């Protein structure tokens, strides 16, 4: 594991701990915490935010491409993807899942072609 990869997964793990602490049943206060408020509102509110953030990510990418921006010039994409990842992490936490679960799934798929991976899902029912 590279240092950058390790630091990235550490950030995700720390954020997962914070998200877990924001659940109302763990003392998160919906009056003081945006995340606690999302948890209190439930799946539909979280899913709505994911949809909004996904749309904003798409628009940032389209805008960057139209402007000929790539790399560091396309920082709006990174900003929007961070929002999207954050809200998907809220969803994961709401289902008792963590970023490690997603990383493990990505590791399982590593080295598989997309066609093989899709076929393996059909075999799983």
From Swiss-Prot:
Pathway: Amino-acid biosynthesis; L-histidine biosynthesis; L-histidine from 5-phospho-alpha-D-ribose 1-diphosphate: step 2/9. It catalyses: 1-(5-phospho-beta-D-ribosyl)-ATP + H2O = 1-(5-phospho-beta-D-ribosyl)-5'-AMP + diphosphate + H(+). Its main location: cytoplasm. It is found in: Cytoplasm. It is an enzyme of class 3 (hydrolase). Its EC number is 3.6.1.31. One of its GO terms (biological process) is L-histidine biosynthetic process. GO terms for cellular component: cytoplasm. The keyword Magnesium does not apply. One of its GO terms (molecular function) is ATP binding. Keywords: Amino-acid biosynthesis, ATP-binding, Cytoplasm, Histidine biosynthesis, Hydrolase, Nucleotide-binding. Pfam families: PRA-PH. NCBIfam families: histidine_hisI (TIGR03188), PRK00400.1-3 (NF001611). Belongs to the PRA-PH family. This is Phosphoribosyl-ATP pyrophosphatase. It comes from Cupriavidus pinatubonensis (strain JMP 134 / LMG 1197) (Cupriavidus necator (strain JMP 134)).
């Amino acid at each position: 594991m590279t240092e950058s990869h390790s630091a990235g997964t550490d950030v995700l793990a720390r954020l997962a701990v914070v998200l877990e602490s924001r659940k109302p049943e763990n003392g998160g206060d919906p009056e003081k915490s945006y995340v606690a408020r999302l948890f209190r509102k439930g799946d539909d509110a979280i899913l709505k935010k994911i949809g909004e953030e996904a749309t904003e990510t798409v628009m940032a990418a389209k805008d960057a491409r139209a402007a000929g921006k790539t790399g560091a010039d396309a920082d709006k994409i990174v900003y929007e993807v961070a929002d999207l990842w954050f809200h998907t992490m809220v969803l994961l936490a709401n289902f008792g899942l963590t970023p490690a679960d997603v990383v493990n799934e990505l590791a399982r798929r590593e080295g598989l072609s997309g066609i093989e991976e899709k076929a393996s899902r059909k075999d799983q029912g």
